[in-house]
Amino acid sequence: MMKGSPPTVEEERALCAVGYRAIAGIDEAGRGCWAGPVVAAAVILPERVIAKPELLDGVADSKMLTPAQRVALFERITSLAVAWAVGSVPAHVIDSHGILPATRLAMQVALLRLPLPADVLLIDAVRLDGWPLPQRVLVKGDVRCLSIAAASIIAKVMRDRFMEGLGRYWTRYGFAAHKGYGTAAHQEALRRYGPTPHHRLTFRPLCDMAPANIRNAALEGEQP
C-alpha cells in the first residue's frame, strides 16, 4: 500500500526548463536477491505527463505497492511512455563482477535498448560513470521523482514475471512466491536441494555452502 507523499515532476520540469526533452528515468529491481537477475528499466515519459502528472496518479516506489497495483500501473505507464526498455544481468555475471557493476550494466543495457535515445538521465542512487549523457543521481529517487518511480515499477514487474517463469521449471524453490528474495522458505529450499544455476553464489547464505552441496537439480527432475 502506498504511504507518504507521491513522487513529483519537479526534476523533470527543471530539466525541461533548460531545454531537455527526452528525460529517461532509471531504476533497478532485484539488487538484494539471492537468486535471479538484477533488472533495470529506463522510461521516457511524454511532456503531457510532465505537465499533468495526475495522468500517472498512484505511481510510487514499487516497494510501496501491492503486486496488483504494480501490474495495473505498469500497463498505464507503458501505454503512455514515449519509450521504455529493460536490461537484465544474470546471477553468474553478478558473481563474477559484483552487484554494483552488474546493476550499472543492466542500466546501460536498458538505455541502449530504448527505441528513442535519451538526452538526460534521472537515476536512483547509482551514477553511470563514463556514460556520455548528463545525469542527475537522486538518493531515494524512486520516492521523489515520477520518472524514476515509473522505472522502478517497470523493472519490478518485468523481473517478477521472469522469476515466475523460472519457478515453472525449478519447481522446488518457490521462485514465483519469493521472487528470489531471502525468505525462510527460500533458505529451507537451499538447505534441502542446494543452489540452482540462477543463484548468486557470492551472496550469503550461498557463499557459506560447501561446493559439495551445490547439486545439479536437473538430475533430480528439475529443468534448467
Curated annotation (Swiss-Prot):
Gene for this chain: rnhB
Binding of a divalent metal cation, residues: 27-28, 124
Entry protein name: Ribonuclease HII
Residues annotated as domain RNase H type-2: 21-223
Keywords, in A-Z order: Cytoplasm, Endonuclease, Hydrolase, Manganese, Metal-binding, Nuclease
Subcellular locations according to the entry: Cytoplasm
Cofactors: Mn(2+); Mg(2+)
HAMAP family (alphabetical): RNase_HII_B
Source species of the chain: Roseiflexus castenholzii (strain DSM 13941 / HLO8)
Example of a GO biological process term: mismatch repair
Any coiled-coil regions, as ranges: none
Catalysis performed (reactions): Endonucleolytic cleavage to 5'-phosphomonoester
Function: Endonuclease that specifically degrades the RNA of RNA-DNA hybrids.
The protein's Enzyme Commission number: 3.1.26.4
Enzyme superclass (EC): hydrolase
GO cellular component: cytoplasm; ribonuclease H2 complex
Domain of life: Bacteria
Cofactor binding mode and count: Manganese or magnesium. Binds 1 divalent metal ion per monomer in the absence of substrate. May bind a second metal ion after substrate binding.
First-listed, main subcellular location of the protein, grouped into a coarse class: cytoplasm
Entry similarity comment: Belongs to the RNase HII family.
GO molecular function per UniProt: manganese ion binding; RNA binding; RNA-DNA hybrid ribonuclease activity
